[in-house]
Amino acid sequence: MNKRMNELVALLNRYATEYYTSDNPSVSDSEYDRLYRELVELETAYPEQVLADSPTHRVGGKVLDGFEKYSHQYPLYSLQDAFSREELDAFDARVRKEVAHPTYICELKIDGLSISLTYEKGILVAGVTRGDGSIGENITENLKRVKDIPLTLPEELDITVRGECYMPRASFDQVNQVRQENGEPEFANPRNAAAGTLRQLDTAVVAKRNLATFLYQEASPSTRDSQEKGLKYLEQLGFVVNPKRILAENIDEIWNFIQEVGQERENLPYDIDGVVIKVNDLVSQEELGFTVKAPKWAVAYKFPAEEKEAQLLSVDWTVGRTGVVTPTANLTPVQLAGTTVSRATLHNVDYIAEKDIRKDDTVIVYKAGDIIPAVLRVVESKRVSEEKLDIPTNCPSCNSDLLHFEDEVALRCINPRCPAQIMEGLIHFASRDAMNITGLGPSIVEKLFAANLVKDVADIYRLQEEDFLLLEGVKEKSAAKLYQAIQASKENSAEKLLFGLGIRHVGSKASQLLLQYFHSIENLSQADSEEVASIESLGGVIAKSLQTYFAAEGSEILLRELKETGVNLDYKGQTVVADAALSGLTVVLTGKLERLKRSEAKSKLESLGAKVTGSVSKKTDLVVVGADAGSKLQKAQELGIQVRDEAWLESL
């Protein structure tokens, strides 16, 4: 039986690849169904012999308890946005300062969910959401139900690939029809539907909803020398790669492609929200490098957002965690990009003055980045009142005087005891990108704050289970989960805590870079500003902000209290040792190592202060080679780069 099951699995997986990836099936649907039913019958009779890559795994049946956190071996960066031809020209100019004659590759920006797929010896072992770029959620069982994701590869590879998981428009219509018939609320758009589907705990639901993918990158170090060759390699491995792409030599060619795609956009079977432009050559990508948040070798052009008219009814003013007071417009409801919009940001007081927005105005509303509703401009021909908006002079939360600094566009409350700032700071501290305390969302934080149970972030770690039971709507099971989530967050690596403290200009990526260098928040608090500013990708603004924060009254007390409650202040990732043997050097690993695993070699190099990259360029300082090193060794020799072997690395 085992032999026949092997034959059926191999056949069915090949036929599935022909159907979903190549769009060139060699057998009829009825023949595929016949073989599939035969396999199901055999697996039912011999369950102990079911193969890991059997296509029957794509059918639901598992109900998951939840999704575990998963640390990405290769971080997922966001992309810099561009909204005009001028911004693309500026991107091109920046690239040409480093790369004389770049070739670009243009790909469609799929409006879906970013995923990372990891294979070991050719078998899918992990499917993970993007999350914050460093930590995502393990949704492997759900992604196994996406029919065009290969469960096994034709080669026994260790590889991590990235792509977008989306819901085709036809599937979206079918899903919403079923929900309507069942009296359930319909999804606003295919992206929301895909996101909701991938977070289903019942994998049978995922299997029914016909999600699809486009893969676009090999995340693990690639032996290909260009993005285009990388995409073709992904196709060879059985992944679906979007065929709508071009190579371009200049922005004129890119702009023509963007216009062409814009005209075809509505006729595509899936949603897109732009075009991604990348430098095609991978060595050039290495030379250009990254900012704290995004690669310097890529940009995402976003199509102009849909616009609608709405009437301004009133304005609410709210205080954020940094004291900035933001105006939000209350509007007559309009349908915009698949959702009903009745509130939109007015950004700040300078924006209101610049756009001359007045009471009862008719305004144009759009979604900035296709996400955040915002007021774009006034329809002056429909103005009914000359009365200007009321601009507050006092904080809506604490009634302190508001300040409007010359170098800022917003009103600001500088009262450190402002209740709104404290509460927003607590919400930020517990959020996913910060301490990631599951269940401790805005509503619970607001109740805790109102009950005077928390007044700063250290108080969160003094809470007991019974404290949550004092809150309306919180039962014993929820209280236990909240308490457990808080205790678990104490073990987070310190970059999560640093970001959670809400220090101005210090985002999640900067927090990680800082802790990699200084190893602990205590070390960072004592660091010299010049040393902070010298760290690559950071600078004087962040250094000054950190100095101001740690010098402020109460910061030392807060850190001491956090430490006393058991919160970890040390970095748990791979640190950078300032005086290590390879400190500051860019190193490439190539060839087959005899004694060390590649991951072990990479970790050792990083522990010695090196930055390990996948391609040899003029910025490479050292190449460590094993057997069959190939083109990377040749490139290193051509550039006169120092070459070392495995024995040398072991001796360090």
Curated annotation (Swiss-Prot):
The active site is at K109 (n6-amp-lysine intermediate). The gene is ligA. This is DNA ligase. Belongs to the NAD-dependent DNA ligase family. LigA subfamily. Residues 577-652 form the BRCT domain. NAD(+) binds at D29, S30, E31, Y32, D33, S78, L79, E107, R130, E164, K278, K302. The keyword Flavoprotein does not apply. Keywords: DNA damage, DNA repair, DNA replication, Ligase, Magnesium, Manganese, Metal-binding, NAD, Zinc.
